[in-house]
Every structure is written in structure tokens, then in C-alpha cells.
A protein has these predicted regions:
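RNA-interacting cores
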Residues: 1-171
Length: 171
């Protein structure tokens, strides 16, 4: 189910979901969401990621787990640096190495060709990418909070145009 967060009817739903996702705090009159990124405290060995809208990961044709988590980690760190308490305090290389130990066990992905036309310049801009389902297996407890966060932030290129929406479920 897709939701346009700019649609007034979606605002109550979006506010409720964000409240459930993290603790909402007031900061200088603006609302702020705190999303816990600590590993979940149970064993998770398999997840299914549904790439809802066309997703493009720069330099990657298939969303292997290491590349996917690197892009999510970088987006979360950048958002924290710009709007939160600062970039993630973690060993990025070690995180990436652990993520690369998770393997894709199923891939049912399609490449979708799409584009938009700029109203200002008339130029056509590609919005293509893969959609579908990928399943991953491995030690996932550390990574599930990042995948859940990516549901809200998107992942990959051109998320501002609606690309990179994903959902995740434990299987």
C-alpha cells in the first residue's frame, strides 16, 4: 500500500506510524523522530524485502545485501548528520563486511523503465529501476532496524521522485 505523505488525508496515518516507529520529541518547535538502530534482541535468520517502487542502487544491478545495507547505512548517517545528533558512530567497514555475509536466497525482480518530464526544462529524466522481491538469509538482527528505517527514508537514487520505496518482513 503506497501513501502520499503530502496528502492531507494521510497525515494522521503518517503521524501514527511515525509515533509507533520511534519516540517523537519536540525540538525547537519542530517534531523529531528518534529511530532506535540497535540490533533486535532475538534471532532473525531470514527476511523478505519488497522493492515497491523502482529502485536504483548506483553501480549495482542486483540488490545483494552488502550493497543494499551500505546504501541504507549511508542514507541514515547523512540524515542524522543533517537533521539529528550527527553521523552514525560506527565502524562502516566492519558493518559492510558483516552485511556482505548475508546471502540472497531468492530474487524475483523485474526492471521497470520509467521517466518523468521536467515542467521547467522539458527534459526527460529516467526513473527506472528494479521492483519485486528479494529474500535474504544470515545473521540479520543487526540489520533489521536499518531495513525498517529504509521503509521510511527510501534507498538508492532519486528517492525524492518516489524511487526506492521498500518494505521488509521476517520469514
Amino acid at each position: 500500500m503506497g501513501v502520499n505523505v503530502f496528502d492531507e488525508k494521510a497525515v494522521p496515518l503518517f503521524a501514527r506510524v511515525m509515533a509507533e516507529l520511534g519516540e517523537i520529541q519536540s525540538s525547537s518547535g519542530a517534531e523529531r523522530v528518534v529511530v532506535p538502530l540497535a540490533p533486535v534482541e532475538r534471532t532473525i535468520c531470514r527476511v523478505r524485502v519488497h522493492f515497491v517502487t523502482p529502485t536504483e542502487l548506483k553501480g549495482v544491478e542486483r540488490p545483494d545485501f552488502g550493497a543494499l545495507l551500505s546504501r541504507i547505512r549511508d542514507r541514515v548517517s547523512t540524515l542524522r548528520a543533517l537533521y539529528g545528533p550527527g553521523p552514525l558512530a560506527m565502524d562502516f567497514r566492519a558493518f559492510g563486511e558483516r552485511a556482505s555475509q548475508v546471502y540472497m536466497t531468492r530474487s524475483d525482480l523485474d526492471y521497470v523503465e520509467s521517466s518523468r518530464v521536467s515542467k521547467n526544462t522539458g527534459q526527460r529524466h529516467p526513473l527506472s529501476g528494479f521492483t519485486g522481491i528479494a529474500e535474504y538469509e544470515g545473521e540479520l538482527a543487526e540489520f533489521v532496524p536499518f531495513l525498517e528505517t529504509a521503509h521510511w527514508t527510501g534507498v538508492g537514487r532519486q528517492t525524492v521522485w518516489g524511487k526506492g520505496e521498500l518494505s521488509v518482513e521476517e520469514i
